[in-house]
Each structure stands twice: as C-alpha cells, then as structure tokens.
C-alpha cells in the first residue's frame, strides 16, 4: 500500500540503491481500498472514472513518493484487461509518461503481465523516459524476461534507454 513511505525514515530510504513501487493498492473516491490483482477487491462502477482515478494514483505516486522506478506500470485488473488498448488512451499514457519525465522515474517493462504496450514504450522513449525490466513473479518464471527482450527489439531500445543505479 501507499503507507510504505511512512514505514521508513528519509534517512533509511536515502541509503537504498534504488526504490521502486506501483499503484496496485489504493483507495477509490468512495473510500474502497483496492488491491488490483485481486478480482474480489476491485470496484469498477464506471470504466472511464476508474481509469482516471488510476492514472491520478500513478501520477501521484510519481510526484509524491521517493522512487526511482515505477513498476507494473499500466497494470489493469482482470475485469478490464480485454479493453487494455482502448482504456489506455493516448491522453492517459501521456499523463503517466510526463509524470515519469518530470520526476526522473524509470518505467518497468514487466515480463509477467506483458506491460506496458509497445505504443506506450515508444512514446515514453521519445519523451526521454528510462526503462527497467522485471517480472513480478514468485514462481518458476522468475527472471524470465521474454516480453521485455521482445520490446527492446520492437521499440528500438538501446542500453542508454535503461535505468542505471547511481552510487550515492
């Protein structure tokens, strides 16, 4: 959840090589706490309203939390997955991309969920966003980065397009 920021002092956070998070746990405007990967905890009364709230959460995380990488970047709950390309409009993608640029935050290319889309990655690359690769897996597929490798080729990513740890 969002409370992780209060669980560590600023001094402790400053000692980390890097910090990553997502917005997969949040509370909607009706006060309902959601964990987006758990279908029974997701509330979608109106798809566009949900998406606008989700984008607002993502942008808020990028603006307000001391992170280096944003992971599970364009994750949608199961109920919305079939409409991924429709719901992730150019305007919504641009808000997330601009927040990443403004706050110098890398975006994860997630091999497990196969997100973000090539369209998002190409737009983010053009805007100067850096990338990382990850899986969010806890099973035998941990470390399997096939989708990320595919996106490197498809989107023309080069080594300089990737996040690099800077020793503090």
Task: Show which residues each predicted segment covers.
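Charged catalytic cores and adjacent phosphate/nucleic-acid-binding surfaces used
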Residues: 84-168
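Extended substrate/RNA-proximal surfaces in nucleic-acid metabolism proteins
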Residues: 1-102, 157
């Amino acid at each position: 959840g969002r409370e992780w920021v209060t669980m560590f002092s600023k001094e402790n956070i400053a000692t980390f090589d890097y910090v990553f998070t997502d917005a997969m746990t949040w509370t909607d405007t009706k006060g309902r706490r959601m964990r987006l990967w758990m279908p029974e905890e997701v509330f979608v009364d109106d798809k566009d309203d949900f998406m606008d709230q989700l984008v607002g959460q993502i942008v808020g995380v990028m603006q307000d939390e001391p992170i280096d990488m944003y992971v599970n970047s364009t994750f949608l709950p199961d109920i919305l997955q079939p409409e991924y390309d429709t719901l992730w409009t150019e305007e919504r993608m641009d808000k997330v991309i601009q927040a990443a640029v403004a706050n110098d935050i890398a975006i994860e290319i997630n091999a497990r969920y196969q997100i973000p889309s090539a369209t998002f990655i190409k737009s983010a690359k053009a805007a100067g966003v850096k990338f990382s690769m990850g899986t969010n897996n806890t099973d035998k597929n941990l470390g399997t980065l096939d989708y990320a490798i595919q996106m490197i080729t498809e989107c023309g990513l080069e080594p300089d397009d990737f996040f690099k740890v800077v020793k503090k």
